[in-house]
């Protein structure tokens, strides 16, 4: 049910030309209950750990993990992506966030995916907690870990503020676009 609502929301957003304004001003969203979101986040992490064992080793060194179990992205020239997530500190749900992006350019389709950001130091956690929305690419450095990068990382070579893993991709999105993702705290 949550996935269907997310897809409908993303499709509706993709059809508006005021996408960046409309999604940036939505401070509170209720796509899933707190219990559902916590369960989905924990299940997503377990699935991530089974497919990327390095992520589990990374979790033991991380100060916190920001998990977005289901991001829905859709577009036809104008596009958008939305999902809600939870910040886990010490393995427990602490705060809730949304992930929003708008895009324009040559693109068509819809897809869903999840991602987890491992915040490796107090600086990264503090930035997330005190910022009025974290725009990826501004603030702490984030390294997106793919299969190739994972092979070259070890717990002794970790130097960046945050590491992100994208998982559970479904659907098809043909896209060459300008995108930015903003993570903002939501009330739960």
Summary of predicted features, one role per range:
Residues 5-13, 17:
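Hydrophobic alpha-helical targeting segments used for export or membrane insertion
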Residues 1-3:
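N-terminal secretory signal peptides that target proteins for export/translocation
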